[in-house]
Curated annotation (Swiss-Prot):
It comes from Helicobacter hepaticus (strain ATCC 51449 / 3B1). Disulfide bonds: none annotated. Its EC number is 6.1.1.1. This is Tyrosine--tRNA ligase. Transmembrane segments: none annotated. Residues 339-399 form the S4 RNA-binding domain. The gene is tyrS. Belongs to the class-I aminoacyl-tRNA synthetase family. TyrS type 2 subfamily. ATP binds at K233. A motif ('HIGH' region) lies at residues 45-54. The lineage of its organism: Bacteria, Pseudomonadati, Campylobacterota, Epsilonproteobacteria, Campylobacterales. It is found in: Cytoplasm. InterPro entries: aa-tRNA-synth_I_CS, aa-tRNA-synth_Ic, Rossmann-like_a/b/a_fold, S4_RNA-bd, S4_RNA-bd_sf, SYY-like_C, Tyr-tRNA-ligase, Tyr-tRNA-ligase_bac-type.
Length: 400
């Protein structure tokens, strides 16, 4: 019964699980002998700070820790300078080593908001990839063909559309796969857009004649606040794990009611049965969606702060939106005198694009210092402004 329960929790929410029986054997061995096994997941620090999208993987790693897994949290400081082409329609711009190092430091500091330090080792893939050398790289590339690389859907589309694919993009999955050779773990986790790369690691373990082939688990990508694209800092649709309790709580309440269930499944500690019961209560009118969403916001905010700050965030939110008050912890943005209002809204993170800003203004969603503004061509003069889009998006803008 213990093994069955452990495997149910481990497999919850996963998209695909390759080598599940091997993991069952490892978990059973842990229960019988106390012998632990190795689990890894890699994160390229392409932007500073972790967000809730990252925590889908982190929480699964934490689950493995409870059932005998020692986690190797891999920071791809080498591969981040190249850029993962997975799902991309064009070549990514490389990051500088300085940018990557600064971003990696934030990951290193924040990962223990989820993982147990006792069973976590932080690794950097520059340690072995810097030492690979020309001969090592040639040996590595000899294990894969161009035809095999073109099995990837994103590469195939770009090739058929005569879009550029750089050689280094072909090399990226091999370098990521070589991480599996260097660390020789039992299991690797990744987002469902990473399946090809994870299987490359499995193949390379076999090619380098290691004594195991890692099991592979893929997990869903968490949609961001827009409910469409995956959560990303570059799309400004993210909830950061270091954001203030007030901001985190308010952002969670801003997701739509349908997306709420996705967040429950991927982020909540409630069992699937409990989530189904909540959903039934909403569908039958015995619970209001807002109250259920507040429960989720309180749980997640408590996890990354504490219960007192989460309760204070709820009070602050209720004051803002039931009493039409302005939040006290507004993000502050600076713009130049004469900046176009649509551009200001994008800079302040209130709109994704100037075209969306125009639409919001036409819809009457814009308020500046509590006054509704309908002028799409407005240019702000020197001063400080409280800018608001809709009921829940605020920013303080300083024009200088």
């Amino acid at each position: 019964m213990k093994i069955k329960q452990a495997m149910q929790e481990i497999s919850r929410g996963c998209v695909e699980f390759i080598g599940e029986e091997y993991i069952r054997d490892l978990v059973e061995r842990f229960y019988n002998t106390g012998e632990r096994f190795c689990v890894k997941a890699g994160f390229d620090p392409t932007a500073p700070d972790l967000h809730l999208g990252h925590t889908v993987l982190l929480q699964k790693l934490a689950t493995f820790q409870r059932y005998g897994g020692d986690v190797k949290f891999l920071i791809g400081d080498f591969t981040a300078t190249i850029g993962d082409p997975s799902g991309k329609s064009e070549t990514r711009k490389p990051l500088s080593a300085e940018q990557v190092k600064a971003n990696a430091l934030t990951y290193k500091e924040q990962v223990f908001k989820v993982l147990d330090p006792q069973y976590t080792q932080i690794c950097f893939n520059s340690k072995w990839l810097n030492e690979l050398g020309a001969l090592g790289l040639i040996t590595l590339t000899s294990h894969f063909s161009v035809a095999r690389m073109l099995e990837r859907d994103d590469f195939t589309k770009r090739y058929n559309n005569n879009q550029s694919i750089s050689i280094v993009e072909f090399i990226y999955p091999l370098l990521q796969g070589y991480d599996s050779v260097a660390l020789n773990c039992d299991i690797e986790l990744g987002g469902n857009d990473q399946k090809f790369n994870l299987l490359v690691g499995r193949s390379l373990q076999r090619a380098y004649k290691l004594n195991k082939e890692q099991s592979v688990m893929t997990l869903p990508l968490l949609e961001g606040l827009d409910g469409v694209h995956k959560m990303s800092k570059s799309l400004n649709n993210y909830i950061g794990v270091t954001e203030s309790a007030n901001t985190m709580y308010a952002k969670i309440l801003s997701i739509n009611d349908e997306m709420m269930w996705r967040y429950y499944e991927l982020l909540s500690s409630l069992s699937l049965q409990e989530i189904v019961m909540l959903k039934e209560q909403v569908n039958t009118g015995n619970a209001h969606p807002k109250a259920v969403k507040e429960q989720l916001a309180l749980e997640i905010t408590t996890r990354y702060h504490n219960i007192d700050l989460a309760k204070q965030a709820k009070i602050a939110f209720d004051n803002v939106f039931s009493k039409d008050e302005i939040p006290t912890d507004l993000a502050v943005f600076t713009c130049n005198e004469g900046e176009w209002i649509a551009r200001v809204l994008v800079i302040a993170g209130l709109c994704e694009s100037t075209s969306q800003a125009r639409r919001d203004i036409r819809a009457g969603a814009l308020k500046i210092n509590k006054e509704k503004i309908m002028n799409e061509e407005l240019k702000l003069s020197v001063g400080e402004y409280i800018v608001q889009i809709g009921k829940r998006r605020f920013a303080k803008v300083i024009i200088s």
